[in-house]
């Protein structure tokens, strides 16, 4: 009689552990899905920044070669506008670098979460309730 109670308790404890592990996997999966959505948004932002940076870099490259020493006042104006373009270029390139760094961090975090999920799935076997 005592043996059957102990065996029943052990089975219940195993079921509880399994359910807790499944709950952990579901929580990690939810976190992974949210991170993947954020990653896709950041990726779209990164693509947009890349296009903008390419345009601005080309514009800045052409602006730095347009100086003419024949008219001093125009040269000063050109230099000021070039400085402005270069600062804008620098800002966009910084944003792009930050976005790329953020994407890299997100990829690493997603890989860690996926590894945790895989590890937890090894511990438990999902059984269809039929």
Model feature map: region roles:
Residues 8-55:
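Immediate post-signal-peptide N-terminus of mature secreted/exported proteins
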